[in-house]
Every structure is written in structure tokens, then in C-alpha cells.
Amino acid sequence: MSEFELDARRMLCPMPVIKTQDKVNELSEGDQLTVFCTDPGALNDIPAWCRINGHKVIETKEINDEVIVVVEVGSV
């Protein structure tokens, strides 16, 4: 398992989800991706995308005006 980060700050919906999808497609099953966003909708949108696409959300949190979502890549 490897860990990766994606900076999706200052991007508005739907770009954080699209960038997450693009990055996940480059990774292997079991890898973890931490996504940093400033779009509050990403707190719901990225986990919903993960459920639909077979990935696991490890953690979601809001710190100040930032949303952080940690995703474990499933089999793609």
C-alpha cells in the first residue's frame, strides 16, 4: 500500500470528484489517497462517488474551511 495526496483546493463542484477519479485511476488496489478540498460539497460528493465505484472512505473531516477525505482504492 502506498499513500498519495491530491490538492483539489479552490476547485468547485464537480472538479474535486473528477480529479479524484482521475488520480484513483492511476493507483493500485489498496493505495490510499488523501484529498484536500475547499468545496464543502466534496464532503458528501467524494464519499458518494466512492460507494458507487467500489472504493472505501477511511476518514472524512473538516478543518477550518478545508475538507479532507481519505480514500482506499478498491479493485478498479
Predicted regions span which residues?
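Intrinsic-disorder/low-complexity, polar/charged segments enriched in Ser/Thr/Lys/Arg/Asp/Glu/Gln
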Residues: 1-3, 30-34, 66-68
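Amphipathic, hydrophobic secondary-structure cores in small proteins
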Residues: 19-55
